[in-house]
Amino acid sequence: VRAIRRASAAAQYPSYQGSYTNGAIPSAWLPLYQRLRADGLDGPDLPALFASMGTPSQDPMGRKIKELYTKAFAPKPKPTPPSSKPTTPARPKPLVYPGVITAENVEKCRAFLEANKSAFDYAERTFGVPRQISVSLLFVETRLGTFLGKEKAFYTLASMASSRRPEAISTYVAQLPGSTAADRQSWIQQRMEQRSDWAYKELVALLKNIRSSGEDALAMPGSIYGAIGLCQFMPTNIGHYGADGNGDGVVNLFTVPDAVASLANYLAQHGWNKAATRAQKQKVIKTYNRIDIYANTILGLAEAQGYVAE
């Protein structure tokens, strides 16, 4: 079936040189480079790729450890005494992302559907996910492919994968209150190893996809933690849910047909059903992003285009 054809594991390495150089691999990358080689991922592109990336960034792992550390150890705010509570009611939280469900954005979605009709026809026919849902998800994720992330996906994941000890993110660790205590150092070390192993799996999946799709690893944009493409898949999701929407034998999430087919395949495999209630459909969308406002916005934007959720 065209929609679920996966890229061959024996795909050729990219024939382009991209922005690679042929210098020496910086020492900070060598453990990661050797690990990839030991896991059977060596190739003529690998040395040049690592030689072209400078040194690892502290930011991806540093941001994540700071987030986890703050959640685990920051003092909890004291409850407000009844006598000092404000008398005016708090402003309710928005149910949808502000500024998304507008007449202008509805027209952008409709124009995108018209311009890519065959891709949405195929995805809807194959996976049963309405085109208004698919285009609304693409709009929320990447504004229909116009904003694909500010980071470089391969460099981000490689930096995280290579950051296994606190010294690798020393600038961030120094800013964490109490981080010099032995038990906190042990906590940081353990979390870094866990996140490094996670990033390594994503990096391996991304490298395989880059080799099959022919994308330039150094130029590929991504989110702050390595999600890629119009539909913002983490690389390991490509192997599970990536779909070849244009029949060229590879999954390239930077093409509209593959991105639309892949996100529709994802929703279908997570239980999308035409007969489901609106609440059940919202639950399926939340497997893509777990917060209510995300699912509410996608459903609301789809309904503004004429989709009836139940």
Stretches found by the model and what they are:
Residues 1-222, 226, 231, 236-310:
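Cell-wall glycan-active module
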